[in-house]
Amino acid sequence: MLDNSRLRIAIQKSGRLSEDSRELLSRCGIKVNLHTQRLIALAENMPIDILRVRDDDIPGLIMNGVVDLGIIGENVLEEELLNRRAQGEDPRHFNPRRLD
């Protein structure tokens, strides 16, 4: 069970952004062992949980409040926005940000 007092971040468990996401977390000073097969990793030095999931699942996890933020590629974001528009939803509350 995830603790709601901790920040929950979803990243790809494998794929193009997996290693870049790990590197970003490390550069942010987040110490976490992501080299195991566990799907949930706890940061050692901050109240942060890292969830390793399929990239296509990350937008839904954010929208459903399972995680607080996630790292996805532009292709996944565009696909999710198109799906929400097709379903008649207003995708503006899905708030994309770019980190360079």
Curated annotation (Swiss-Prot):
Entry keyword Cytoplasm: yes
Pathway(s) it belongs to: Amino-acid biosynthesis; L-histidine biosynthesis; L-histidine from 5-phospho-alpha-D-ribose 1-diphosphate: step 1/9
Signal peptide: none
Catalytic activity: 1-(5-phospho-beta-D-ribosyl)-ATP + diphosphate = 5-phospho-alpha-D-ribose 1-diphosphate + ATP
Chain's gene name: hisG
Thylakoid found in the keyword field: no
Lineage, opening ranks: Bacteria, Pseudomonadati, Pseudomonadota, Gammaproteobacteria, Enterobacterales
Documented EC number(s): 2.4.2.17
Summary of the function given for this chain in its UniProt record: Catalyzes the condensation of ATP and 5-phosphoribose 1-diphosphate to form N'-(5'-phosphoribosyl)-ATP (PR-ATP). Has a crucial role in the pathway because the rate of histidine biosynthesis seems to be controlled primarily by regulation of HisG enzymatic activity.
UniProt activity-regulation remark: Feedback inhibited by histidine.
Highest taxon of source: Bacteria
UniProt-recorded Gene Ontology molecular function terms: ATP binding; ATP phosphoribosyltransferase activity; metal ion binding
Family: Belongs to the ATP phosphoribosyltransferase family. Long subfamily.
Cofactors demanded by this protein: Mg(2+)
Subcellular location(s) per record: Cytoplasm
GO biological process: one example: L-histidine biosynthetic process
Subunit structure: Equilibrium between an active dimeric form, an inactive hexameric form and higher aggregates. Interconversion between the various forms is largely reversible and is influenced by the natural substrates and inhibitors of the enzyme.
Protein name, per record: ATP phosphoribosyltransferase
Keywords: Amino-acid biosynthesis, ATP-binding, Cytoplasm, Glycosyltransferase, Histidine biosynthesis, Magnesium, Metal-binding, Nucleotide-binding, Transferase
CC terms in the record's Gene Ontology section: cytoplasm
